[in-house]
Amino acid sequence: MSPNKHNLIAPETALIGRATSITPSLPHAVNGTILNDEKPSNYSEIIIGMGCFWGAERLFWNLPGIYSTAVGYSGGFTPNPTYEEVCSGKTGHSEVVRIIYDPLIISLEQILTLFWESHNPTQGMQQGNDIGTQYRSVIYTTTPNQLTYAQHSKQCYQQSLEQQQLESPITTEIEPAGTFYFAEDYHQQYLVKNPNGYCGLGGTGVCFIPL
């Protein structure tokens, strides 16, 4: 039986996965970086999910200060999942974008401003017409300072929503990052390879105002 699309699966009932990981075989289709290389020293990494990862990745890859982006899966229980397994709802993972950036050129505030304004973070286990736990809104941080700022930014955006009479609570999951699993080559920089491909992103129309 398929899990309920609006409820995360329990760890003990998640798919068992596999020992072999998916390793990107192609460089980044926009900037040519090697996706599975170690990030350069003094660069930062954050993982975000905001619905279908095709459109989410496109938001970031051309921004000044972005070294690399990659799509994948995180936040669940199944090791080395496939796209089909994630879409089944039986892994607990969300579709995410790993962003490696130079904090001297682009700030975490700038990245999260785009995050908050470009999707609806109040929709729980869906984003627009895309329904399922893999489409939930998430921020997975890699440093304590990132975690603190991400939580603060959520409070700021909740206040901005309420000022515009949008009082639904933000459901974005904010946690220290666990393992990031690369998605298949087909999904990396998908909207470069398929310019007319699907993108279901849509924001609330409310601006993020730092407090």
From Swiss-Prot:
EC number(s) stated in the UniProt entry for this protein: 1.8.4.11
Keyword Repeat attributed: no
Keywords of this entry: Oxidoreductase
Pfam families linked: PMSR
Any one GO MF annotation of this record: L-methionine-(S)-S-oxide reductase activity
SUPFAM superfamilies: Peptide methionine sulfoxide reductase
Identification of the protein by name: Peptide methionine sulfoxide reductase MsrA
Organism (species): Photobacterium profundum (strain SS9)
Organismal lineage: Bacteria, Pseudomonadati, Pseudomonadota, Gammaproteobacteria, Vibrionales
